Design a protein with these regions (language model features):
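Acidic/His- and Gly-rich active-site-bordering loop/insert found
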Residues: 9-148, 168-186
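Generic non-transmembrane alpha-helical segments
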Residues: 45, 64, 68-72, 271-282, ...
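Hydrophobic beta-strand positions in extracellular immunoglobulin-like domains
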Residues: 92, 253, 374-376
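Acidic/histidine-rich catalytic neighborhood of metal-dependent amide-processing enzymes
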Residues: 143, 149-238
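Acidic-enriched catalytic cores of C-N bond-cleaving enzymes acting on peptides and small amides
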Residues: 171, 178, 212-216, 225-234, ...
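Active-site-adjacent substrate-binding region
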Residues: 276-285, 306-310, 415-465
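C-terminal substrate/ligand-recognition segments
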Residues: 360-392, 409, 413-425
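Zn-dependent metallopeptidase/amidohydrolase metal-coordination segment
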Residues: 408, 434-503
Length: 505
């Protein structure tokens, strides 16, 4: 693997952006506490507005959001290009756009800040859940239900920030729907869209086409960064600066049809099994700039025991090379969910997901079809992904395997030295002086795959302070999805500080 370069650009971020104290520190504590609690109440309502995709029915959740925004005196816009697939947006005005109606919303100095979320959730089978996934159960200090983590909880945090900004306006005797929010230079846009879980074509892609002003901004913040992961007693806060793309393959493996009483090596299913084994082997670590900065941050902060396990992870070429990496080692080990995430983001991955073959129990299959889901790092092209697949299959099996790359979406990445990252680092460090802040590549896609190519830098930042024992990463699309009331309230304060740090006069 290629040696790392140093230092990373990201390591220089996080300077003190709040010399006069955090903006949230100037808010009446009673108000701050109330808004934090209301984030939990809002999340309960959003969970109960079941919006499983497919089919979506996001309009249910959109109507809840519209009502909550109207209670703040705002006049949100609604866009439903497909029946029951609703989208919502609202804008709070800053002084820059009020002074210059023709201001470019992507202007680096005065352009808008976009907070955006998706309204849909993945299905939730009741099996394995200890609560009804769509009841919005509140117990043990947590809000439980599908979407609590992905990502109605983050939307509730964003809504909490909007509530605080509206309170600023009302305290000055102003109308938050029409007047400039006191102290705000940039516009703040909150947009919630449909269909993220199945690609966004029926959601954010249509919004970009038909309601581009809902998204146009100097920078956007969305899901999946800023929450704590505890490793070897240290709190790590990954800030999402990039996300992997995807390449989906259909492999058709040929063999010879025959009677099962006379088996031989021409069995297509046997060949497919070999292909599965070869395809799924972890490839070499790819030190793209984002991964260089990530590993450098971990090396600088983690104790030797944890780093030893990380170094083994960097060197593995088969899953068996690091068979014990998922086991907890008190005082020395990284959290299992961190190791699994690192294994995924440090390289292009290839995961066999569907294998179909055979017609009867007594017939040797002459054909097998294998579906492979590949997730690719920034810089991996369609041609490179195809070439990698062919190389994995090997020259000996290549004559029997037809490789068809059926779908491709390039990875997206953003500058690691953007001003808003420094502000986010400062907001977290002001609360946690021992925080390990690092850039992260998401192993999955978000709606940033639409906004980044449209010229809107987009970072994953939905901050939560989590209990060290909480396996938050496993809650994404998992059973008993939940987030604590305390985490939501903390997230509202941190995100408010970031918004004001970036958008204030």
């Amino acid at each position: 693997r290629r040696a790392m370069s140093a230092p990373s650009r990201f390591a220089a971020t996080g300077a003190d952006h709040f010399p006069a104290g955090l903006p949230s520190g100037a808010i009446d504590p009673t108000l701050l506490k109330r808004i934090g609690a209301e984030a939990g109440d809002d999340l309960v309502q959003l969970i109960r507005a079941e919006s499983v995709n497919p089919p979506g029915n996001e309009t249910r959740a959109a109507k809840v959001l519209i009502e909550l925004l109207r209670r703040e005196g705002l006049d949100p816009e609604f866009f439903e290009p497909i029946p029951d697939r609703g989208n919502v947006s609202v804008r709070l005005r800053g002084s820059a756009s009020a002074a210059n109606p023709n201001l470019d919303p992507r202007d680096a100095r005065n352009g808008a800040l976009l907070l955006f979320a998706h309204l849909d959730v993945v299905p939730a089978n009741q099996d394995g859940w200890t609560v009804n996934p769509f009841e919005g159960v509140v117990k043990e200090g947590y809000i439980w239900g599908r979407g609590a983590v992905d990502m109605k909880g983050a939307l509730a945090v964003q809504l909490g920030v909007i509530r605080l900004l509206c309170a600023r306006a009302r305290a000055a005797g102003l109308d938050p729907a029409k007047d400039v929010i006191p102290g705000l230079r940039r516009d703040i846009i909150l947009t919630a869209t449909a269909d993220e879980e199945t690609g966004g074509l029926d959601g954010i892609a249509l919004v970009l086409k038909e309601r581009r002003h809902w998204l146009d901004a100097a920078v956007g913040l969305t899901e999946a960064g800023g929450m704590t992961i505890t490793a070897a007693g240290r709190r790590i806060y990954p800030l999402q600066v990039a996300e992997k793309g995807f390449a989906r393959f259909t492999l058709t493996v040929s063999g010879r049809w025959g009677h099962a009483s006379m088996p031989d090596s021409d069995n297509a299913l046997l060949r497919a099994a070999q292909v599965v084994e070869r395809v799924s082997v972890p490839g070499p670590v790819q030190f793209v700039p984002e991964n260089e900065a990530l590993v450098a941050a971990l090396r600088a902060a983690l104790p030797a025991g944890a780093m030893g396990r990380l170094e083994r992870l960097l060197g593995e070429t088969t899953f068996a090379d690091a068979a014990d990496l998922n086991a907890e080692a008190p005082g020395a080990g990284c959290a299992p969910e961190l190791l699994r995430a690192l294994r995924a983001v440090l390289r292009d991955t290839f995961a066999p997901t569907i294998l179909a073959s055979g017609i009867r129990s007594n017939v040797l299959p002459g054909s097998a079809t294998l579906t492979v889901d590949s997730r690719i790092l920034p810089g991996t092209t369609r041609e490179a992904a195809h070439r990698n697949m062919v190389e994995r299959i090997g020259a000996d099996l290549a004559p029997f395997v037809d490789v068809n790359l059926t779908e491709f979406g390039a990875a997206v990445s953003n500058p690691m030295d953007h001003e808003i990252l420094g502000i986010a680092c400062a907001a977290i460090r002001s609360r946690d002086g021992e925080a390990i802040l690092m850039p992260a590549v998401a192993p999955y896609a978000t709606d940033a795959k639409i906004t980044v190519p449209a010229g809107i830098p987009t970072y994953g930042f939905s901050p939560y302070l989590l209990d060290p024992k909480e396996r938050f990463m496993e809650r994404f699309h998992g059973v008993d999805e939940r987030v604590s009331q305390e985490a939501l309230a903390w997230g509202v304060e941190v995100l408010y500080d970031v918004v004001m740090g970036y958008a204030a006069e």
